[in-house]
Regions:
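Conserved catalytic network of the ASCE P-loop NTPase/AAA+ motor domain
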Residues: 1-2, 26-30, 45-49, 70-75, ...
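Conserved nucleic-acid-binding Ia/Ib motif block in the N-terminal RecA-like helicase ATPase lobe
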Residues: 4-63, 131
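Flexible beta-alpha connector loops of hexameric P-loop NTPases
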Residues: 13-14, 71, 86-93, 117, ...
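Conserved nucleotide-binding/hydrolysis micro-motifs of P-loop NTPases
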Residues: 13-16, 41-43, 59-62, 86-88, ...
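Alpha-helical scaffold elements adjacent to nucleotide-binding pockets in ATP/GTP-utilizing enzyme cores
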Residues: 18-26, 60, 76, 95-103, ...
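SF2 helicase catalytic motif II
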Residues: 54, 58-62, 68-111
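Conserved interdomain linker/interface between the two RecA-like ATPase lobes of SF2 helicase motors
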Residues: 101, 114-172
Length: 172
């Protein structure tokens, strides 16, 4: 189990803590260790070595991958999951782009494969994100509302009222 690592990148510390707790509970019976790595939670080299899944914020993972002293650790990473990848178009997008570009460059120079997976519940431009991740067509999966266990009904209502109070009453 210590031959490779999985990194799960979540956009907020609260989400990192939640995912760490959920995965720890589900995977502990399999002997898989899950740890949080954020600006508030630091891991020693030995803790990192004995951890199989690291849940991190984009900013912390960006810092780790920039350090040349962490190269051996980074080379053990075989899977990077980026949750909420639609944030590429957000103010934090450049950090995610940097992580993706650095990972792709590392794969090209070391010839050690690392899989990049992007997750989002709201991603209308999934083909563009697939291009950023350099995903082949057969490796790009998009699940529309037809895959939902409970059908999703959408309704659009137009409000033409211009006056604030009346407009709010109509919207509510």
């Amino acid at each position: 189990l210590s031959k490779f690592k999985v990194v799960y990148i979540a956009p907020m510390k609260a989400l990192v803590a939640e995912i760490t707790g959920n995965l720890s509970n589900r995977l502990k019976t399999l002997g898989i260790t899950v740890k949080e790595l954020t600006g508030d939670v630091h891991l020693s080299k030995s803790q990192i070595e004995e951890t199989q899944i690291i849940i991190s914020t984009p900013e912390k993972w960006d810092i780790i991958t920039r350090k040349t002293g962490e190269r051996l650790f980074v080379e053990k990473v075989k899977l990077i999951i980026i949750d909420e990848i639609h944030l590429l178009s957000d103010s934090r997008g450049p950090v995610l782009e940097s992580i993706i570009a650095r990972t792709i460059r590392q794969v090209e120079t070391s010839q050690l494969p690392t899989r990049l997976v992007g997750l989002s519940a709201t991603l209308p431009n999934y083909k563009d994100v697939g291009a950023v991740l350099r995903t082949k067509k057969e490796g790009l999966f998009y699940f529309d509302q037809s895959y939902r266990p409970i059908p999703l009904e959408q309704r659009y209502v137009g409000v033409t009222e211009k006056k604030g109070v009346r407009k709010m009453l109509m919207i509510n």
